[in-house]
Structures are given as C-alpha cells and as structure tokens.
Amino acid sequence: MKVKIEESWKEVLNNEFNKGYFKKLVKFIKHEYKTKKGKIFPPPKLIFNAFDSLPFKDIKVVIIGQDPYHGKNQANGLAFSVDSEIKIPPSLQNIFKEIEKSLKIKTLPNGDLKRWAIQGVFLINTILTVEEGKPSSHKDIGWEIFTDEVIKIISKNLENIVFMLWGNLARSKKKLINPTKHLILETSHPSPYSANNGFLGSNHFSDALNYLKQHNKNKINFQ
C-alpha cells in the first residue's frame, strides 16, 4: 500500500505516525485494501491527498468533511471533491451555489477541488477511508484520533486560519481550535437535507476572504 504525503507534513506528523493506535490503523487499512480489492476508497495513493496537495505552512482555510464518498470512482482524498470527469455530488453542488451567490462569481463546471487545495485550502475528512456502499464503515478504527490531532496541530502551530465547520460532526471539532488565533465559521451541512438550515446564505466564503485580506494573506479563487 503506497501513500503520498508532502514532505513538510512528514515532519509535522512524525510523532503521530509512530503512535500505537496509528500503527494498528495502518495494519487494519492494509488488510482492508488487500482483502476487499477495489472496494475501499479512495485508492491507497490518494488517502493522504489532502496532505500531499499543499505544504503545512501554506494552509489558509480548513474545511472539515465526514468520510469519503462511498460510490465507485468518487473519492479522491480531498473532502467534498471528485475528479473532473465525475458528476458533481449534491453537497458540492450546494457549496458551489453558495459560492456563486456569496462571491458573485461563476464556479467551474467540475468538482475537482485540487484547484482550491493548491491555493491553501486544506480539505480534510475526519475519516480518510470507506468501504464501497457503506458510509461510516471505517468509523472508530483510529482515523478520528488522527484527524483530531491534525486539527489541534494546525490550531497550535499556525496563525489566522479560517476553519469552516459544516454540520454537527464538523462543529464538534470546535473544541480543538483556539478561537483567539483563528476564525471559526459554523453552519449546517451542505447536504440537500440540511443546506437550507443555514448553509445556503451563510456567506462563509466572503467572510473567509475578508478575514484573509485583514491578515495580509493572498486571496483564494473559489471558482
């Protein structure tokens, strides 16, 4: 099982990678990929795609998702993202809808959010793998411990980051973030079931850009 991760992250996460729970997690995941060939998403090399897409110090915005898409060919290791040839999922359609309304721009006609990641948007799911057709199938195997630590490390070691917490699971991570150092934006999940409960009309993207500008950080193009 080969995974890719950007060099600066290896240093930042070295302690975590050497902890007992993480070694158990890796053992379990390797077994899953080996015994359920083609049924575990994303492909192994993309598990850490969020970490491989931008250096640690370049993070400006953190968007927290739940677990990867569980349909074939959907998950690509970036929360809410799909490859450019894949139909845009409903939650991401609502994200684009909110961006267009809030920022008065036209989003691109594909769901590959690598274009955001390389500008400093860290798109992290709380669980990094899933079995086909079984949402939350890799819950409580260790991923949440790992991603909680990642959020804490970002909060502790970086300054003036925008954290977008959408839905109850993401909002439960608020306690891991220092509110005196960072901007925390909370609302409902962009899923069709809850987008009208606050997400649509939240203006999170315009709030984020204003905050970045106030702290002399380069603008992100959310198209």
Curated annotation (Swiss-Prot):
The keyword Transferase does not apply. One of its GO terms (biological process) is base-excision repair, AP site formation via deaminated base removal. It catalyses: Hydrolyzes single-stranded DNA or mismatched double-stranded DNA and polynucleotides, releasing free uracil. It is found in: Cytoplasm. GO terms for molecular function: uracil DNA N-glycosylase activity. It is an enzyme of class 3 (hydrolase). GO terms for cellular component: cytoplasm. Gene3D superfamilies: Uracil-DNA glycosylase-like domain. The active site is at 67 (proton acceptor). The keyword Hydrolase applies. Its EC number is 3.2.2.27. Keywords: Cytoplasm, DNA damage, DNA repair, Hydrolase. Pfam families: UDG (PF03167). Its main location: cytoplasm. Excises uracil residues from the DNA which can arise as a result of misincorporation of dUMP residues by DNA polymerase or due to deamination of cytosine. Belongs to the uracil-DNA glycosylase (UDG) superfamily. UNG family. HAMAP family: UDG. NCBIfam families: PRK05254.1-1 (NF003588), PRK05254.1-2 (NF003589), PRK05254.1-4 (NF003591), PRK05254.1-5 (NF003592), ung (TIGR00628). This is Uracil-DNA glycosylase. It comes from Borrelia garinii subsp. bavariensis (strain ATCC BAA-2496 / DSM 23469 / PBi) (Borreliella bavariensis).
